[in-house]
């Protein structure tokens, strides 16, 4: 009953759902960092880029503007690369960006291979299997085209973000972390 109420509330309040999703994504990133350190941030980046690419084709309206659901997850990617840059250096941040890029390419290849498998035609599951196959094909056939453009934008913007973060750090020293985080992220958008 509470789950139904909450679901209906969020369906009818997309901006609150967006904020909840954003906070959940950033919280999971922090949790992974707290539990696993640098490796946790690398996992968070790879996971967020996968979510961004899989959910990217889904469009919705937030604050009256049409947007892709995938953009929500870029907040945690920028956050994670900034934390990596600050605490582990430019090389580690760039390595995490490259890992996210490669994980997405692997996903495209493996999901494309999965589409080649024919659904079962066993009497008890043939209709279900065909329906799932068709739904899967709808998402996966669109995803590679979406991911290729997204990956290029991701790679360029993240590399620039890491570069800008360290260029600002070189000028300000250890002071003004807020400036490095915000200026590098805003300029790389």
Enumerate the language-model features and the residues they cover.
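Internal alpha-helical transmembrane segments of multi-pass membrane proteins
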Residues: 171-187
